[in-house]
Amino acid sequence: MIVGIDASNLQRGGGVTHIVEILSNVSIYKHNVSKVIIWGSEYTLSQIDNYPWLKKVTPKELNRGLFSRLIWQKFGLFNSAVDNNCDLIFAPGGSVLCNFRPIVTMSQNMLPFESREARRYGISWITLRLILLRWLQSKGFKSASGVIFLTNYAKEQVIKVIGNLSIPSTIIPHGLNPRFCEEPKKQYDKAKYNSENPFQILYVSIVDQYKHQWHIVEAVAKLRKEGYPVVLNLVGPSYLPAKKRLMESINKFDVNDEWVKYHGPVPYLELHHIYKEAHLGVFASSCENLPIILLETMASGLPIACSNKGPMPEVLGNAGIYFDPERSIEVYHAIKKLIDNAQLRSEKSQASFHKVKRYSWDVCAFETFSFLERVAINHHQSLCMK
């Protein structure tokens, strides 16, 4: 079997990480696959290692803008798949524009399907883009030969919007890079911490409208006001309007620039070092499909104060302390509860560390290609019966 992978709309972030990891972890010969063809931009394909069975293709349209990529998906993908004798196309970006069948797609972005979250962007190009993505992905999920979801939550939310699916679907969560795995540290009483040795709180995430960093700043400010020797470390790139809101919050609550440390983006290959310096992790997003950063925080052996929205309770289970990310007072109580109780911190960090072990790129790669193989076989059998 020859599998084609449409990576034309994968530019950065989790989508690229996913395709890099499944290709580096799959044993294609376990799935009756002889060759994999992948189409993507030069930048995307440069991040993927070379393998004897992998052919990388970059049509000139994929190095251009969104419109050019969509035109290629509609017309160029079909011809290239036929020319390469593909038996199936895997489109992990969620869009299905060409008429080639069978084709399997994937749900990786929840923002287009959660209107309340999308409205945070007001009248903007991002809102228009989310509307376009919602239309494209809804159409893609309905017309595909199979769909992969990352969580039960994501599947339920998408089905609420587009209705029940009549095609095969499955749930295959992403994996986790083992370099993030760090046995939970010994937890100390809060009396151990002081201004010279402060309690380090870490929140890794892009600064964006649905990530709520400003509420975390306000919550930690209340802890500081009560005498807790805490420092808040914020790590990640930023969306400019959200960054402005964050800076306003920092200027309001940390006037002397003493305890909020915004580090900006940190290279992915160095990120695990950041987790090692923290004493507690916070995750305050209100919109996720499968929160990779939450998995990284769990694997890093940190006690976690976590948003109660989206799939977070499904992923973290009873291994964290939850809060409403839009209510700073709830964030304050969740963090305070963990700081005040070293035994609770120890129990939660151990529980989350063991829970995250089920997220494996080996398993993700095996289950993904098994599903692709199953869809291809079913499609072939249905053609033979006609």
Show the residue positions of the predicted features.
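A conserved mid-protein helix/loop that constitutes part of the nucleotide-sugar donor-binding site
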Residues: V16-S24, F199, D208-K222, I329
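Glycosyltransferase donor-sugar binding loop
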Residues: I38-Y43, L176, V231-M247
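Short hydrophobic beta-strand element within catalytic cores of glycosyltransferases
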Residues: L294, P303-C306
